[in-house]
Design a protein with these regions (language model features):
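Beta1/beta-strand and adjacent pyrophosphate-binding region of the FAD-binding site
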Residues: 113-121
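Flavin (FAD/FMN) cofactor-binding and adjacent substrate-gating region
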Residues: 15-19, 59-79, 151-153, 183-262
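Predominantly flavin-linked oxidoreductase catalytic cores and closely associated redox partners
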Residues: 146, 248-318
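Short beta-strand to alpha-helix junction loop
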Residues: 91-95, 173-182, 243-258, 356-357
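N-terminal secretory signal peptides and thylakoid transit peptides that target proteins
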Residues: 2-20
């Protein structure tokens, strides 16, 4: 004891007589209780206003899923050389540049100088641009153009996930998948900026541990970088765990519009046309056909391994201040902010060909999103 804590001899005698000396000494010498500093928020979290009067529309897209993964393959039909590039599941926007690079490699060895590209979504446009970069005269033929493609429905997170069934792929395919992911990331990184609508944002995986994250995140450390585990108090949501990382967010309407303009400005031609059978392809003037029809390959080329995976979104009014992505493990929902609105998902309905919103799915997404943003724990 020292300073003001010193007890005088007279006070000691007095306290001893009262039986209080031991208590006084022990109290003076006891360590002071240390209060842990408050947990600081990881960042500012502008909150999404989930309200029925803010719903702009609902969106439905059919992901072209193949358990064995996407197809990048050469084919010869009649008098045409055909290079296939389809079947990306939920990763079409993400992988578009990478698989198109692989497809272009196959096409360049054939010696043509002009080609037809079937499809005008993310994969078709990336393929068309890469062929233009190589000096090809390129014409796109497509049933639907932006903003009416499946790629326009994509919420936009750069994420090579839900592309295949891990029990149905070969080691050779997986190596091709990893290469395509790396290639695609490299192309997108050069497009970061408002013109193409590509930006880097924080992703928050609530209800996840690092081990729970998709395998591709662990396979591509040079892309995903640091994985940070957060604790309650660092975020304003009623979730026990959270892992955060950074990825690109692709504002698909902005991106697809810019890509289509680039293609046309470099001399590319686009025709709206629906091919009902392969025989119609043989009438095209181009000797080389790049098939980027997605789910259309089920009908046009008879690929019965393809199946639709229906995805449904609720689109809220835009909130420009929301600049991060949330994915909630227990509830199976996600939020991604785009310029045209806040995208609330998610759903995966395998084998469902309907493009009509399912009211039960809408109610589930809305209810779980409302609970999450109001601070209730996820299911």
């Amino acid at each position: 004891m020292h300073g003001n804590d010193r007890i005088s001899r007279r006070e000691a005698i007095k306290l001893a007589g009262m039986g209080l000396l031991a208590a006084a000494v022990s109290g003076a010498c006891a360590p002071k209780k240390v209060t842990a500093p408050p947990v600081r928020p990881y960042r500012n979290f502008p909150m999404v206003n989930v309200s029925s009067d803010r719903i702009v529309r609902q969106a439905v897209g059919l992901r072209p899923f193949r358990p064995g993964g996407f197809v990048v393959r050469y084919d010869r039909i009649g008098n045409k050389d055909i290079v296939h590039n389809y079947g990306h599941g939920g990763g079409g926007l993400t992988l578009s540049w990478g698989t198109s690079h692989l497809a272009a490699e196959k096409a360049l060895s054939l010696g043509h100088r002009s080609c037809a590209v079937l499809g005008c979504g993310a994969v078709g446009l990336a393929t068309a641009r890469l062929m233009q970069f190589q000096g090809y005269d390129v014409t796109i033929y497509a049933k639907d153009l932006p903003p009416n493609t499946t790629s326009n429905v994509a919420a936009g997170q750069w994420s090579p996930f839900t592309v295949f069934d891990e029990n149905s792929i070969t080691p050779q395919f997986y190596n091709e998948f990893i290469r395509a992911s790396r290639l695609s990331f490299g192309y997108y990184r050069k497009l970061i900026g408002p013109h193409y609508g590509v930006r880097v944002v924080d992703n928050f995986y609530f209800g996840y541990s690092v081990a729970d994250l998709p395998d591709a995140i662990h396979e591509l450390p040079e892309i995903y970088g640091r994985l940070t585990t957060l604790i309650p108090g660092q975020y304003p949501f009623n979730e026990p765990t959270c892992v955060t990382l950074k990825t690109m967010l692709i504002d698909s309407p902005t991106y697809l519009n810019a890509m289509m303009n680039d293609f046309r400005n470099d001399g590319g031609k686009i025709f709206v046309r629906n091919f009902g059978e392969i025989g119609e392809l043989l009438t095209l003037r181009e000797p080389l056909i790049m098939n980027c029809t997605g789910l259309g390959s089920y009908f046009l080329f008879g690929d019965r391994e393809l199946e639709p995976v229906k995805g449904q979104l609720i689109v809220l009014l835009p909130q420009p201040e929301v600049d991060y992505i949330t994915l909630v493990h227990g509830a199976g929902i996600y939020m991604m902010p785009r310029s045209d609105g806040i995208m609330l998902g998610g759903s995966r309905d395998y084998g469902n060909w309907s493009l009509a919103p399912d009211p039960e799915v809408t109610e589930r997404i809305f209810t779980r999103q409302s609970e999450f943003w109001s601070g209730q724990p996820s299911v």
